[in-house]
Structures are given as structure tokens and as C-alpha cells.
Amino acid sequence: MLLLWALPLLLGAVAGLEVCYERLGCFGNRIPWSGGTLERPFSTLPSTPKIVNTRFLLYTNENPNNFQEISADASTIRGSNFRTDRKTRFIIHGFTDKGEENWLSNLCENLFQVETVNCICVDWKGGSRTTYPQATQNIRIVGAEVAYLVGTLQSSLGYSPSNIHVIGHSLGAHAAGEVGRRTNGTIGRITGLDPAEPYFQGTPEIVRLDPSDAQFVDVIHTDAAPMVPNLGFGMSQTVGHLDFFPNGGKEMPGCQKNVLSQIVDINGVWEGTRDFVACNHLRSYKYYADSIVNPNGFAGFSCASYTAFSANKCFPCSNGCPQMGHYADRFSRKTDGVGQTFYLNTGDSSNFARWRYQVAVTLSGRRVTGHVLVSLYGSKGNSKQYEIFTGLLKPGDTHLNEFDSDVDVGDVQKVKFVWYNNVINPTLPKVGASQITVEQNDGRVFKFCSTDTVREDILLTLTPC
């Protein structure tokens, strides 16, 4: 894949100025679309619609496993399981990918678990499996084809564009932007999954995804390190109303595995090889798929930077936490501005959802050197132990920390405290927690108290004060 991204820097060539197609209109290769700028040094026209061969693969709750191919011919839509009383979600893949790749249909399957929906996977492998600069031009054809289908839905079936959500990964995110531009921002929502950076970062809004392309635009950035020298394929530039940078947006947990373990992936050699080449870049659609079935597991925190977030300076959410992914549109202030930036942490495997808690522990008992851990027990489940503090344990001192649990414990009902010496202590001191306060990201606070102290490695249970 890296070769395909880099090769165009040597192979760009000057083409004609404009080409027109009856259904889709005209496409030129002048600035800002192509040639003459630092971001787009080569002049290239899109491939023909026949070569790009945009296809629409419809999955619904009635046919979740086998697609029905539809087109902008209204008769194919009426003869399918498409229903006008449902939302429609388009999914557009990126460079070198295809619409029949498992991740697109898997995303549809997750959607069917939580809603009744028309899920349309857009295949444009005829235009994506070429040199990278050519593919960046071919997304204009893809966007035009999707927009034409949206127009058919509106004119022939009375279907409102506001009921349409376009989800695009990599180059597909900018194809989604082209859909929005051609439909004058009437699309209900566009989600950009790590929008591609080369040939798009720093370009005018007309070329790339931007907030004016839909009534609401949300973006997940997972590979935002610079293309040179870090080989980051995704944009660092904010291009939505809400821009989420999980784990800081550059290096995703689980993407640092050794080469062999990553290629021989649990999902097979093909998926493992894809992960090895572009693990961070692919995480965006995996996070989105996981967010569908974890409605509150991807809370984003408004913060000046990921460094500030990691330093526990952004908790709780004073104006509420938007959820990264599928439920981002439930955030009441989603369109209060553009480029609203949010940070969060995720897991490193298939269960990416995390629930962040802030815990304050007030110590009692002896003065010793050691470290303190707590675990939460709640109405939905129990967390593992998380370290709150290490150092001098002094009675009366309060230590505060935040952690990301892989379990949503629900309403916290009790807390278990344990401590350990940092050095061997023959005096067998006892330490306790007179009070532990647990705060959730929505601002709810739970307080627990105890008058007991315990020796190291002995659990102390605190109950509500």
C-alpha cells in the first residue's frame, strides 16, 4: 500500500482540461482540483464512470447477509427491500478497498442490531485500485454517482436527503464530502472515518470534506501523524463540527504488535496484513462499528490537547460528553461550532469501548511508602483494580486519578481498596481509606466511607457514606 501512495510522486502527468458526462456533469483538472499547488502537484482527470463502476449494494434488516444491487434507476429501488420510512446509511470505502470487503457488511450487521435501516455499501474498486493521485480524482465520480442516486430517491420516491447519513473511510470520507457539496449541504449527516491526508490536507473546502457538506459532520482521526516521515495516512486538520482524536489521534493501542503477530491476525492473514500496513488508519471504522453496540462507551472530552487530557485536566464534561461514532448526533451542542475537538482513550483489541472515572482517595492509618489501587462495583458490572497513587501514603492526604475501565459499572454501589508496600516493612503497618469519591463523566458523584484500616494486600470494602 505504501508503494501505491508514494509512486504517484514520480508518475504524475498532465492531462486535458475538462471532460463531461450526461448524468454527472463536467470535471476539470485545474486548480484547486489538480495541478499547480503544493498539495496537488500533478494534473489528472477522473477516470470515466464506466471504469470507476460505482455500485450500490443494499443490505436491510430483511436481507442482512446478502446484498441487493440497486442503481439510480427507480425501478431497481422499488423492486428491492429499500423502505422510505427508514433512515439510509451509505458506507464508502477508501483507497485500494472494495465495497464487498467484510468491514462494510459487518458495520451494516451492527446497525441492524440497534435500528431498522437501509444500509448501502458503495463499491468503487474500479477507481480505488489505481495510483493514489488517480484515486483522489476518481472520488469525484463516486461522489457524483451517490449524489445522483440521492436525487433519484428524492424525485422519484419523495425521500428527504435529511434522512441520509453518508459514512466514508479514508478517500471515502472526501467522496462523502463531494456528495454533500453536490446536494448543497442537505444531507442529514456525514461521518468521516480518518479522512485521507495526502492531496487533501490544507486544500480549499470545495476539494475535501468540510462542515458545510451536511447538516452535521463528525470525524474520527486515528492516523493523524504527518505523512512524512511518520507515514500517517489520515488528516490532522479538523474538518467537521465534531472532531474526535482517540488516543491522541496518531498511535492506536494494539497497533504496535510485532510484525508476525500482526500479520497472523485473529481475523485471518488478509485482515492481519491490512492491519500491519495501515493499522492506525483502519482503526477508525473498527471504532465506529464498536460504537454502534456501545452507546456510551466512547465519550469524548473537550480539551486543549491530548497532553492535557492525559494529565487529568478535562474531567468531567461541563457541557456533556459527545459520543464518538454512531451516536455523535445525540450531542445537544453538536452544531454550536466547527472544529470542536474531543479526546478519549480506547481499548487495544476487539472491545474498544472504555468508560472513564475520576477517583479521589482520602487515606487513613499509618504513614508508609506504597501504592494504592481501587476497584468499582456497580449495578452493571465490576471493574478490575486500577492504581490511584504511588509514593508516600500519609493519613489525611487525598489522591486523585482517572482511569478508563473496560467495563461500564453503571451506578457505583461499593468500592474496594487495597494497598501495597513499596519496600518490605516488618512492622506490618495498616492503611485505610476514610473516604473514596467516584465521579462519572456525566458529573454524577458517588461517595463511600470506612473507619477500618488493613494490612497490605488485604481488600477493604467501602460502602456509601
Curated annotation (Swiss-Prot):
Active site: S170, D194, H281
Chief location: secreted
Subcellular location: Secreted
PROSITE patterns with a match to the protein in the record: LIPASE_SER (PS00120), PLAT (PS50095)
EC number(s) given by UniProt: 3.1.1.3
UniProt domain PLAT: residue ranges: 355-465
GO biological process: lipid catabolic process
Residues involved in Ca(2+) binding: E205, R208, D210, D213
Signal peptide: 1-16
Regulation: Inhibited by bile salts, is reactivated by (pro)colipase/CLPS.
Catalytic activity: a triacylglycerol + H2O = a diacylglycerol + a fatty acid + H(+); 1,2,3-tributanoylglycerol + H2O = dibutanoylglycerol + butanoate + H(+); 1,2,3-tri-(9Z-octadecenoyl)-glycerol + H2O = di-(9Z)-octadecenoylglycerol + (9Z)-octadecenoate + H(+); all-trans-retinyl hexadecanoate + H2O = all-trans-retinol + hexadecanoate + H(+)
Disulfide bonds: C20-C26, C108-C119, C255-C279, C303-C314, C317-C321, C449-C465
GO cellular component: extracellular space
Enzyme class: hydrolase
Superkingdom of the source species: Eukaryota
Pfam family, one: Lipase
Entry keyword set: Calcium, Disulfide bond, Hydrolase, Lipid degradation, Lipid metabolism, Metal-binding, Secreted, Signal
Molecular function via GO: all-trans-retinyl-palmitate hydrolase, all-trans-retinol forming activity; lipoprotein lipase activity; metal ion binding; triacylglycerol lipase activity
Free-text function comment from the UniProt entry: Plays an important role in fat metabolism. It preferentially splits the esters of long-chain fatty acids at positions 1 and 3, producing mainly 2-monoacylglycerol and free fatty acids, and shows considerably higher activity against insoluble emulsified substrates than against soluble ones.
Assigned protein family: Belongs to the AB hydrolase superfamily. Lipase family.
PANTHER family linked: LIPASE, PANCREATIC TRIACYLGLYCEROL LIPASE
Oligomeric and partner information: Forms a 1:1 stoichiometric complex with (pro)colipase/CLPS.
Protein known as: Pancreatic triacylglycerol lipase
